[in-house]
Amino acid sequence: MALSKVKLNDTFNKDQLLSTSKYTIQRSTGDNIDIPNYDVQKHLNKLCGMLLITEDANHKFTGLIGMLYAMSRLGREDTLKILKDAGYQVKANGVDVITHRQDVNGKEMKFEVLTLVSLTSEVQVNIEVESRKSYKKMLKEMGEVAPEYRHDSPDCGMIVLCIAALVIAKLAAGDRSGLTAVIRRANNVLKNEIERYKGLIPKDVANSFYEVFEKYPHYIDVFVHFGIAQSSTRGGSRVEGIFAGLFMNAYGAGQVMLRWGVLAKSVKNIMLGHASVQAEMEQVVEVYEYAQKLGGEAGFYHILNNPKASLLSLTQFPNFSSVVLGNAAGLGIMGEYRGTPRNQDLYDAAKAYAEQLKENGVINYSVLDLTTEELEAIKNQLNPKDNDVEL
């Protein structure tokens, strides 16, 4: 059967079945979670700033604080709605600013802290104490600290969330294999911000967000909706503009990976990416519409559970008109490939996967509807035996 005859009815039948369910699953976010409102947004922004100005800062809690800041921008009511719509049973803790007394170096001092169940007052005080040390050092070096270098600069929280936007696009792998790419991108896009803040260490901040998203999956729902809301709001600071660009790339990646993945899942014995290239335009349109219906956030969940599909979707397609496009072109597994792989690790992993499929006799070349030229290109890549191939 030629690939052009393959239809996606199985996908839509499944979707129809799922959409007729009369019941919903309720998940729990835990005993009690912090959901801050707008009124503590400034304080959470300052907490982010304190971490950013601290040299060699401990970023263990940066991801959590960043998510609390994101929720404070959404507001308590909208955050609760997002979680409940996602099927979570929420026991919400209100967050206020209180005065906390703590002994520091033998002297009792007053601090303003937030009433958080996820972050003790002692941890908050320690963040402030360490930041004060770095701030004093900055005063000695600069004489006067310019507003954009201070811990209360209004864009501190958004700087931290830019790292989160980079991380969320890499959750598909199911591990932290995308960390190197996150660091490289952050060093490039946030170059000015890294120069401003000595405590902005992309690797440590990224690991903190990985930890948060892995440990508390409900934060993924919150962050996706926050990202959409933030990116759709006109105006804002330079960093807000950077965030919007990073997030929309991640959001789009979720839809792209879902699109290729749905199509690949519906076609048996065919290299995942190749199916999308060889399918009729009508089918591709169907998948676009299906992805749009589910939304980008659904894409994140799909790729999280289908890393093979995401593996074959992550690189760009440098030459969409090449013969077989090396299974979604950017990877160059089979067929003509023009250009250098953008990600050598992905290329090698995908090629190894292709070779493994061939060794197991899984690839059915006759289904691929190949021309003589395409078949020759495959021979150059995987050296199949003549009796393995049917035209």
UniProtKB/Swiss-Prot annotation:
Which Pfam families does the entry mention? Pneumo_ncap
Identify the main location.
virion
Q: Which subcellular locations apply to this protein? A: Virion; Host cytoplasm
Q: Which terms does the UniProt entry file under GO BP?
A: symbiont-mediated suppression of host innate immune response; symbiont-mediated suppression of host PKR/eIFalpha signaling; symbiont-mediated suppression of host type I interferon-mediated signaling pathway
Q: Which UniProt keywords apply?
A: Capsid protein, Helical capsid protein, Host cytoplasm, Host-virus interaction, Inhibition of host innate immune response by virus, Inhibition of host interferon signaling pathway by virus, Inhibition of host PKR by virus, Interferon antiviral system evasion, Ribonucleoprotein, RNA-binding, Viral immunoevasion, Viral nucleoprotein, Virion
Q: Where is this region: Interaction with the phosphoprotein?
A: 244-290, 338-364
Where does the source fall among the domains of life? Viruses
Q: Name one GO molecular function term.
A: protein serine/threonine kinase inhibitor activity
Record GO cellular component, one term: ribonucleoprotein complex
So what family is this one in?
Answer: Belongs to the paramyxoviruses nucleocapsid family.
Q: How does it assemble?
A: Homomultimerizes to form the nucleocapsid. Interacts with the phosphoprotein P. When in a monomeric RNA-free form, interacts with the phosphoprotein (via N-terminus). Interacts with protein M2-1; this interaction allows the association of nucleocapsid with the matrix protein.
Q: What does this protein do?
A: Encapsidates the viral RNA genome by forming a left-handed helical nucleocapsid that protects the RNA from nucleases. RNA replication depends on the availability of soluble nucleoprotein. The encapsidated genomic RNA is termed the NC and serves as template for transcription and replication.
What name does UniProt use for this protein? Nucleoprotein
Species the sequence originates in: Ovine respiratory syncytial virus (strain WSU 83-1578) (ORSV)
